[in-house]
Amino acid sequence: MVKTITFIKRKPGMSVDDFGQYWRKQHAAIVIKLPGLRRYVQCHTIPSGYRNGEPAYDGVAEVWFDSTGAMREGAQTAEYRAVRADEPNFIDLTKIDFVITEERVQKDAPADPSMVHLVEFVTRKPGMSVEAFQRHWSGVHGPLGAKIPMVRRYVQCHVRPAAYRDGRQPPYDGVAEVWFDSTAAMRESATTPEYRAVRADEPNFIDTTHPVPFIITRDFAVL
């Protein structure tokens, strides 16, 4: 199973509310018609994410297919062309991007729709190979994060090797997804020794020359 994560900013002049409504209703009804689509989740940035200005993204769209082959086949269909044709109605196409990933579950528990969802966009530290980055993130850092008591679910989405062929560099090397019961629980997690251990490990594999972009979302499982 492969998972594509698309990073979305609303089109200029569109309100956050109108963007969310259009995405959840009109656009979702088009996407679910894609051949081969196994699962579709919309992750909408919560209102508090706008208190101090614009967040990194207004949301991310997550879609699952059985394989990259199935995904490519779907992209050749009229249904996919309909999806693309609808995007300018609510998305800023100058800022849209995506990664194709494989999930590595670090803490496996159900993600209830009432939970808040922390989505972090991760770039490996300069000079580190993709293989070493993924190995450390999954084998060392992941178990540290899973120990934080308030964490309900924790999934790492590792960008697939094909994204690096011919010297290419994807927008991010991975996406970390962590679910909490509430924003209060998320804030409380930052006071724990387990969280401090997570932060202390980050320079070992993450580019810390700038803050890690993130959004906090509520999720809508469309399919």
Q: Which ranges hold each PLM region?
A:
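Macromolecular interaction modules
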Residues: 1-223
